[in-house]
Amino acid sequence: MKYLIVGLGNIGGEYNGTRHNVGFRMVNALAEDGGVQFVEARYGAIARMRVKNAELILLKPNTYMNLSGNAVRYWMQQENIPREQVLVLVDDLALPFGTLRLKPKGSDAGHNGLKNIAEVMGSIDYARLRFGLGDEFSKGRQVDFVLGRFTPEEEEKLPELTKHAVEIIKSFCLAGIQRTMNRYN
């Protein structure tokens, strides 16, 4: 089976290491775990790897976050991957920092990347792995928070959290979403 694993983030060096780019961080950790490198391709950087009998297409869209749907649709069509075999890795302000939550579908929760993917797909029925950022920001400072860098304390915890995310992603591809949610959520 073939899966499309999409890490959401903003392109450009100024966004490296920001909270909003934690989707890129998770997909980078997966590529590193698989010993594969990303190459520039249409609509983003792509890497290919295998996990047992599953073929994974890893995607970091090079569109801005709010246009991620174009990249997702293109690679779904290019690789003939059904929506049930797409997993989007995304940041989430509604979850406490470091919480990882796998969902089979759902609203965009105010996330412009998820909103655009749903608009382009015409459906909210696609899986997402949400990485909790927490809500430790003053009213009206949400944008500054997500575009800001992790604190040193948070940064120290990220390697273990991304390792855990890699386990969840692999389980999604090998055991399916329901068994993976039962085990990890």
Swiss-Prot record:
- Which residues make up the binding site for tRNA? Y15, Y64, N66, N112
The gene behind this protein is: pth
> Which Gene3D superfamilies did the record assign?
Peptidyl-tRNA hydrolase (3.40.50.1470)
Recorded GO CC terms? cytoplasm
Q: Where in the cell is it found?
A: Cytoplasm
An example GO biological process term is:
protein quality control for misfolded or incompletely synthesized proteins
Subunit field text = Monomer.
Query: What EC number(s) has UniProt assigned to this enzyme?
Result: 3.1.1.29
UniProt family annotation: Belongs to the PTH family.
Task: Name the PANTHER family for this protein.
Answer: PEPTIDYL-TRNA HYDROLASE
**Site described as Stabilizes the basic form of H active site to accept a proton, positions?**
D91
Annotated coiled-coil segments of the chain: none
The top EC class, named as a word, is: hydrolase
What's the protein name? Peptidyl-tRNA hydrolase
Query: For the site Discriminates between blocked and unblocked aminoacyl-tRNA, which positions are given?
Result: N10
Q: Which residues form the active site?
A: H20 (proton acceptor)
Role according to the record:
Hydrolyzes ribosome-free peptidyl-tRNAs (with 1 or more amino acids incorporated), which drop off the ribosome during protein synthesis, or as a result of ribosome stalling.
